[in-house]
């Protein structure tokens, strides 16, 4: 297999400083296509040239050299247009030797959603409200009385889902393994003093929100959130992989995560500590353990294939229906995806973001999910995993990657991919 000379890795210290994969000169040799599931793009209202432009943008993203594996699924009008993969599950990470045994990724390769898990966890909560089990406007302390300490008695589930609960992190905790201990995490959050009260400020809650939500599910329904997910969503939807964590059998097929881009930058480490409570390197060490996938981390460890993530969002587009079953009511989805407020500066991430109760929202003239995507909703995971639906374009999309670029030249390719999808899938005439 040839290697593109333009992306060949430098040796020695430079290779340790800039992490990139070896990109094959012939990327068709590392491409997987589930042709049995894909339709003719014309059947989904996409011209062949437009479809090819999308795929070329996915290939360009892989060619940046920052992603050992890319899995991509796009549905339009309910039909699968792309269900494909590029790269390797293992054997071609930046620090792997050139002759390391290589395992190709496939369209059905599972990968971790990281923070994109939050949107799915949010729908578990909205489903409970739909069935009268809780009220999202109730204070969290209504369900977890000990959470009321330090003035948090009026902080609601609504505030938590929209990243306005004032507990974006756990002060003084530097060991990322605390997320593996639900009871300890819950105790620390109940004892925590909020940074602000009554939802006055938006600060992205990277991990903390999921701990509280999981405890509410357990106390109200009597089930842990993994069992609730399986009972209410996974089994009725016929999902085989999408779940909190992963079994040993699923984990054996998963992508191996790798840090890519510039390494050793103190600014990146400082940002990660502020958002995640640990550096990206420390997070990756945790993610590389079996304990991480045995645990239930509602804000960050759901595992899925690209097709199943796309299927979940297609269910939302279809008014809550999947496989002939009503999983959610249409009005529940409408409430879940309704904006909480306009784009505001997020005090954790440091950029303007717009949220609903559980989803990141698109924008005008350009947003997280492409151009003119004001009504799109979804979530990103560690910046590069992107899952979303755009009702005006009738698309449900999942882009899963195994590389975690820190400072790298990947953002332009990612933006161009989003723009290509927006261009190839125009908004309906009623919304244009």
Model-derived features with residue positions:
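Short, gly/Ser/Thr-rich active-site loops of penicillin-recognizing serine hydrolases
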Residues: 318-321, 328, 332, 337-345, ...
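Short, well-structured active-site flanking segments
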Residues: 81, 106-108, 120, 126-145, ...
